[in-house]
From Swiss-Prot:
This is Receptor-like protein kinase At5g59670. Gene3D superfamilies: Phosphorylase Kinase, domain 1, Ribonuclease Inhibitor, Transferase(Phosphotransferase) domain 1. The keyword Flavoprotein does not apply. It holds the Pfam family PK_Tyr_Ser-Thr. LRR repeats lie at residues 409-432, 433-459, 461-481.
Length: 868
């Protein structure tokens, strides 16, 4: 282990040296991606004076390339080479940064037909576990992405993800630390949309003109007049725009007209932040006044009063909160006030769009532990790059993770390094994965003793150390711990002695076992004989009896009278028709009448009546009475005037589309009803047919579970039992229950997860137009893209809290997890739904959209890479 520590220390020292080499005195990180090993690194880029270094020590994979020779002269040196990634789906740069410090991060991409195929690559760019942008290199001059972002850990991972047949590539990667307190947001990061200064002719301004190496592009329009000064302009506010940009300004040629910028958004409700920099650079006469207001689509943004420029000194208007154009067209204007004698002026303008990164990075201590484990064993796996847990489809192999709350860091719960050719002792770094539940190190060449720390890991429930060369004794702490411990195939390991039982006790146990087996066999045979003597269940139903004799029992003629001869149909189900009725003159009821052709019979009828007679909960439909007369069976229960949830989600029958807040409340109320069945009943019950059509709504849209014909009891919390028949509705049915026949409360949890996905997306559970794909498949695909707007029901018109939506979506997917052991209980579901509602009620991030692609608008300027 000392040698491993020495190697790790040497690697750490080497990394620090390379980080220092990649930084200049301003703390900049400038990487020339794909710089050949035979070229000098670091080198000074002649036009900017910036120090660029090779990217080789910041990434584990990729190959180097160079743009075609006939294109090299058009581009600066850092953009002539590139790194491309023919292997692996995700390839990531790992950069050391300061946690909670704001950085300007710029990534540049230039294809340059380096491979001679003349096929422009298309791929995704990720920041940690979140999608940053979609890269399409159709432009021969390349493209760039720039963002202002605050890392949540001391490690920043920038990843290129293959999405099709083409190969991802990158030309340069640059990080610039920004001044504390600048470019603040309510939430999210800022993606650069435009950064302009106003001059009729000019070149791109960046370092050393701009101390933060921001790129400023000249812009001017025919209806403007340029004013300039040769004097110095003080630019030392928190944003510190370049002085060269402030020595010129634009004013409208028509002094009474506004100074106007127009563009069209590619998406509705994009959120913007504006930073307008202005300084008075004209000599004003004694009676001259210049003041103006800043407006967006007619909304006055100068809420503290008109903007008044200072003589040769910068002022900056900044958005205090995100602003939307509320449509496709955006109209940003500076309008003079009535008392102003001069038109408005503007020296420079920055426009950013908000981009949300909702997914938290994997817990930092878990990530460090995995890196240390990898270093200890010399593991080199192509997919062990980027965030270990998310996106889910890119999760590191050998790992399982859990993440009940999207805003909290995911945790690693399972590590499987079986048959990985591991040598040495069991790595001490494993103990740093504090929520690890399963550890499999079997069939390697591990030596040494079983470490004491394994017995102190509270979450560990399964340890497999089979097939190694471990020695020594098993630690006392591990022997006392109640877990599954596999140690076979370790011949040098001293196993604890087996406890010997007295012969008399063994004999007694064997005798009792034989007696029990004989009794069970006898009882099964008797049950078979009795069952053979029973009459078919549908020959007559007059024998149906119920445990509760106090309920109202209707005659068939009373049912006819209550329903006015079955005049008004409310719906139809597997049981039969449901009719509207009235009892006691004014009390409205719903009457479910068993159809003679129904696939359900007296057994389901009796089950529903028995359950409704003994359960009483505000979120379960109440039974008024029943009819059992000859072959006529009917249930009479309370009438819920707003019908079922499915109708309202679809908008069928003129039903209104319910908003997001009400949907969350309905979900919570349905969950409360299920929780009562699971833990409030004796014995506990499972519903077995949870779906949107079985969630009914009263006049106040209060939710109540209905249709208990398939409900069954089970032994208790966390347990399951075999079900002789598989029942439920296709798409909502727990696949694990379907395959195993095991019935438990987690079967209802799965169905509830599907219901919640329906409420979130308004997508069909089974999409028959897409090869019968399931809703979980569609949602999983969209989640991996990171765009919540593509997932949410468009009928909601984006009127929801982004964080609340993400939390609900994560909860739904955890409920619908294939393995029932990984699903939450209904009590946990209720807790999470309450958190979602609380998050929604805060109003934070309301109407916040996600913007990934740079807009192609009339203010067009070329992003880096930049031609000479």
């Amino acid at each position: 282990m000392e040698s491993s520590f020495g190697l790790l220390l040497a690697l750490l020292t080497l990394t620090i040296i390379h980080i220092v080499q990649a930084q200049d005195p301003q703390g900049f990180i400038s990487l020339d991606c794909g710089l050949p090993a035979n070229e000098t690194s670091p080198y000074t880029e002649t036009q900017t004076g910036l120090l660029f270094s090779s990217d080789a020590t910041f990434i584990q994979s990729g190959k180097t390339g160079r743009v075609q020779a006939n294109q090299e002269s058009k581009f600066l040196k850092p953009y002539r080479t590139l790194r491309y990634f023919p292997e692996g789906v995700r390839n990531c740069y790992n950069l050391s940064v300061f946690k909670e410090r704001k950085y300007l991060i710029a990534a540049s991409f230039l294809y340059g037909n380096y491979d001679g195929h003349n096929i422009a690559p298309v791929f995704d760019l990720y920041l940690g576990p979140n999608l940053w942008a979609k890269i399409d290199l159709q432009d021969v001059n390349g493209t760039g992405e720039e963002i202002l972002h605050i890392p949540t850990s001391n490690s920043l991972q920038i990843c290129l993800v293959q999405t099709g047949e083409t190969t991802p590539l990158i030309s340069s990667l640059e990080l610039r630390p920004m001044r504390t307190g600048s470019y603040t947001t309510v939430s999210g990061s800022l993606k650069t949309y435009r950064r302009l200064y106003f001059k009729k002719s000019g070149s791109r301004l960046r370092y050393s003109k701009d101390v933060y190496d921001r790129s400023w592009f000249p812009r001017f329009m025919d209806e403007w007049t340029q004013i300039s000064t040769a004097l110095g302009v003080i630019n030392t506010n928190i944003y510190q725009p370049p002085e060269d940009a402030l020595k010129n300004a634009a004013t409208p040629t028509d002094a009474s007209a506004p100074l106007t910028f127009k563009w069209n958004s590619e998406k509705l409700d994009v959120q913007y932040y504006f930073y307008a920099h202005y300084a008075e650079i004209q000599d004003l006469q004694a009676n001259d006044t210049r003041e103006f207001n800043i407006l967006l689509n007619g909304q006055n943004l100068s809420v503290t009063g008109p903007e008044v420029p200072d003589k040769l000194s910068i002022k900056t208007f900044q958005s205090s909160s995100p602003i939307s154009c509320n449509g496709w067209a955006c109209n940003f204007q500076l309008i003079r006030t009535k008392r102003s004698t001069l038109p408005p002026l503007l020296n420079a303008l920055e426009v950013y769009t908000v981009i949300q990164f909702p997914r938290s990075e994997t817990d930092e201590s878990d990530v460090v532990a995995m890196k240390n484990i990898s270093a200890s064993y010399g593991l080199s796996r192509i997919n062990w790059q980027g965030d270990p847990c998310f996106p889910q489809q890119l999760r590191w192999d050998a790992l399982d993770c859990t993440n009940r709350n999207i805003s909290q860091p995911p945790r690693i719960t399972s590590l499987n390094l079986s048959s990985s050719r591991l040598n040495g002792t069991i790595a001490a770094a494993i103990q740093s994965i504090t929520q690890l539940e399963t550890l499999d190190l079997s069939y390697n060449n591990l030596t040494g003793e079983v470490p004491e720390f394994l017995g102190k890991m509270k979450s560990l429930s399964v340890i497999n150390l089979s097939g190694n060369n471990l020695n020594g004794s098993i630690p006392q702490a591990l022997r006392k711990k109640r877990l599954k411990l596999y140690l076979e195939g370790n011949p040098r390991l001293i196993k604890p002695p087996k406890k010997e039982f007295p012969v008399a006790i063994v004999t007694l146990v064997v005798f009792v076992t034989v007696i029990v087996v004989l009794f069970l066999v006898f009882r099964k045979k008797m049950s078979t004989i009795v069952k053979g003597l029973r009459l078919p269940p549908r020959t007559s139903m007059v024998d149906v009896t119920f445990s509760n004799k106090k309920s109202k029992r209707f005659t068939y003629s009373e049912v006819v009278q209550v329903t006015k001869n079955f005049q008004r149909v409310l719906g139809k189900g597997g049981f039969g028709m449901v009719y509207h009725g009235t009892v006691k003159g004014s009390e409205q009821v719903a009457v479910k009448v068993l159809s003679q052709s129904s696939t359900q019979g007296s057994k389901e009828f009796k089950a529903e009546v028995d359950l409704l007679l003994r359960v009483h909960h505000t979120n379960l439909v109440s039974l008024v009475g029943y009819c059992c007369e000859g072959d006529y069976l009917a249930l009479v229960y309370e009438f819920l005037p707003n019908g079922d949830l499915k109708q309202h989600l679809s908008g069928k029958g003129g039903n209104s589309i319910i908003n997001w807040s009400i949907r969350l409340r309905i979900a919570l109320e349905a969950a409360l009803g299920l929780e009562y069945l699971h833990i409030g009943c004796t014995p506990p019950m499972v519903h077995r047919d949870v779906k949107t059509a079985n969630i009914l709504l009263d006049e106040n849209f209060k939710a109540k579970l209905a249709d208990f014909g398939l409900s069954r009891s089970f032994q208790g919390e966390g347990e399951s039992q075999e079900s002789t028949t598989i029942a439920g509705t296709l798409g909502y049915l727990d696949p694990e229950c379907y395959h195993s026949g095991r019935l438990g409360e987690k079967s209802d949890v799965y169905s509830f997860g599907i219901v919640l996905l329906e409420m979130i997306t308004n997508q069909p559970v089974i999409n028959q137009t897409s090869g019968d794909s399931h809703i979980t498949q569609w949602v999983g695909f969209q989640m991996n893209r990171g765009d919540i707007l593509e997932i949410m029901d468009p009928n909601l018109r984006k009127d929801y809290n982004i964080n609340s939506a993400w939390r609900a979506l994560e909860l739904a997917m955890s409920c619908a997890y294939p393995s029932s052991s990984k699903r939450p209980s209904m009590s946990q579901v209720i807790h999470e739904l309450k958190e979602c509602i609380a998050c929604e009620n805060t109003g934070i991030s309301k109407n916040r959209s996600l913007e990934y692609q740079e807009m192609n608008v009339s203010l067009d300027t070329t992003a880096v890479p930049m031609a000479r």
